[in-house]
Amino acid sequence: EEHKIESAYVDDASKIIGKISDIPKVVVDIGGGAAKGFPSQLLEKVGCDVVTINSKLEKSSRGPDPTVDTLEELVTNTKNRDIGFAFDLDGDRLVIVINGEKKDPDVTLGMGVVKALELGYKNFVLSQDTSISVEKYIKQNGGTVFRSKVGEANVTEKMIETKSQVGGEGSSGGFILSDFNYCRDGILTSGLIASIIKKDEFADALNFMEKYHIIRDKVEYDSEHHDDILKALHSKMKEKFGSVETLDGIKAIVDEDSWVLVRKSNTENSIRVSAESNSLEKVRNIHQEIKDLVKESYEQIK
């Protein structure tokens, strides 16, 4: 059953974004979700030429989570447009498609950050598994970065604690601007990104962020073993890397462009292994080495 919602959302969001003068051509992929209507309305209001796909409720050519779907219809429809935006069903996750190529969700956060820096924001909170490229970009442009545990609530908590105006979670393509609201907001973010896609900073930042490769994966183990596995793994990783961070799971900084993070899932019987480097070969090797160490740790404690 559908209900019409009366809301000042589009007007309020458009005030933050401002009017876009160069009329970007955008494609909006609603994914058949409840967020339908709002993204297209907002993007049109700020000055975009908008084409919308998958806008019928509960009817979609793709799955509900744009971070894991191939987004084939959006990719096809974006080839002659400036950018494509794919939302999850409630509009907090956002993935972008440029030149017919789906980008990592960290790039969504990164592009929100580019706009936030342009707006004069200085303090940023990033979850522990967010790309190092976003952190480096912020620091290179005079901003300060704080890291939080993974999860939207942890990011917003750290934002309040550190008086940071902007936050985000790379893994979910989630960008948070506290002057608007304290949650991931893909709809607002799409407008913020649309306002800079024809600027040099957009191309420069995209080029910089795409030099990095991130692998996020999980290995299945019963949750009753998770703590013991991580305890055994902690000493192995410390021995291998010299030092580790334990803000959320176990994170090792391999070098200034590479890291690996192992943490237990809060929602399923799995241990998550994320790794990043500016070398694809290196990130694959690091990721596999640590997955092997997780397995060794399990063999040791079972």
What are these regions (language model features)?
Residues 59-65, 113-115, 155-159:
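Short, charged, surface-exposed secondary-structure boundary motifs
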Residues 32, 89-93, 172, 279:
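Short, glycine/acidic-enriched loop or turn micro-motifs at the edges of active sites
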Residues 28, 85, 190:
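Two-metal-ion RNase H-like nuclease active-site motif
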